[in-house]
């Protein structure tokens, strides 16, 4: 858990780690390895006991402001809602006394406000990905930490990463 907490130390146990993402099927034409690479990463997370939940990308027609050409843009949908729902579920089931959210997404602000109102004794910590500080979430959380670039390098998965069945997954250059 020191990987997530950095310089924030608090006694306690890690009960569950949840990972929320979406498979970018729409990028397959640009980078055919996008989804298979992501699926390999998910296998590694599962092997570490991390529970993942996948959302989706939704295509949306957009108009270029400069040339007025229409194009399709893909937006990740439901991930923030899934995180908010899991946050409230975990708190409702009394599974923890501290929540650590690794995000810079302001869309989670209402869920954090609700969690603090309904469960005032819970400590909420926000970890901000490198260069993704969020003032609103910082104010809402009990404490917040900015993850430094070197933290990512320091806490990479083993390369290769060995799954419980002996399968080895090599780290792609883009990880």
Model-derived features: positions:
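Nuclease catalytic cores that cleave nucleic-acid phosphodiester bonds
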Residues: 51-175
């Amino acid at each position: 858990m020191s990987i997530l907490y950095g310089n924030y130390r608090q006694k306690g146990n890690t009960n569950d780690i949840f990972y929320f993402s979406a498979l970018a099927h729409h990028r397959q034409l640009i980078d055919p390895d996008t989804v298979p690479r992501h699926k390999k990463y998910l296998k590694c997370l599962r092997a570490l006991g991390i529970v993942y939940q996948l959302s989706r990308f939704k295509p949306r027609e957009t108009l270029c402001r400069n040339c007025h050409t229409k194009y399709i843009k893909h937006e990740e949908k439901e991930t923030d809602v899934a995180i908010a729902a899991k946050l409230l579920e975990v708190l409702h089931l009394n599974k923890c006394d501290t929540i650590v959210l690794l995000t810079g997404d302001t869309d989670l602000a209402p869920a954090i406000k609700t969690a603090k109102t309904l469960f005032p004794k819970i400590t909420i910590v926000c970890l901000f990905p490198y260069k993704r500080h969020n003032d609103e979430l910082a104010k809402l959380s009990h404490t917040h930490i900015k993850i430094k670039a070197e933290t990512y390098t320091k806490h990479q998965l083993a390369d290769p990463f060995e799954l419980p069945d002996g399968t080895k997954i090599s780290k792609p250059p883009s990880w």
